[in-house]
Amino acid sequence: MAALSFQCLCVASAVRAWERIESMVDVSFDVIIAASAQTIQLSQQSQQCQLHSQSSAAEAYNTFIRIYGRLVPLLERAITTYATNLQPPLSTSPTFQRTDPRNLTYPLDNQVLGSVLRDFSTHRSLQEQRNPATMVCRPSKMTLGQYEMDEQQSQYLALDVICRTLRNLVIVLQEMGGGENAEIRQVDARLLTILVQVRRLLENTSATLSILES
């Protein structure tokens, strides 16, 4: 860590902020998003710093790659959580049997979501994959503060926030030269396609909610 004293303090702060997150055993959705946004902001500020150097840029880039690897599985969990709760019950039986959402069929407006999930099922992040069907992804009540949201609204918000964060991160990575690596370039292009699909789904959902509330 001593070498960081000769680098831009913004990059040093960004790296340390994310190192704290990686040292935690159990990290909530809110903490990951906040730390990701802070790290991106600090690294962008470093571009204007006189102490900014190639070593600073390389360290920031490596940190972004680690964040990317953490956010992609989070997006998968958010999509799966949202999709699972949109799918109507398959049976009125009291016995609950878990079904992988990627194998379900989606009616009408939810067909886009089904397509996203099927595309995502073959996507592999830089991190070890977890089973998304067993995880729930939504903001905590502490983050929402005075705003009261039902379960579907909070899951919608989680998707929206993750999409925005990932899109900003992918853009930064591409600007820093991530496109030179063919494997990363392919993953980024595919992820951007998924983000566009999810954003379209969210916009359609917002329009539907507005009509219902009017």
Curated annotation (Swiss-Prot):
Pathway as given in its UniProt record: Secondary metabolite biosynthesis
Extent of the signal sequence: 1-17
Glycosylation sites: N103, N204
Disulfide bonds: none
Alphabetized UniProt keyword annotations: Glycoprotein, Signal
Domain of life: Eukaryota
Annotated function: Part of the cla gene cluster that produces clavatol and ortho-quinone methide. The clavatol biosynthesis cluster cla and the terrestric acid cluster tra are both involved in the production of peniphenones and penilactones. The non-reducing PKS claF is responsible for the formation of clavatol from successive condensations of 3 malonyl-CoA units, presumably with a simple acetyl-CoA starter unit, and 2 methylation steps. The esterase claE probably collaborates with claF by catalyzing the hydrolysis of ACP-bound acyl intermediates to free the ACP from stalled intermediates.
Annotated protein name in UniProt: Clavatol biosynthesis cluster protein B
Species for this entry: Penicillium crustosum (Blue mold fungus)
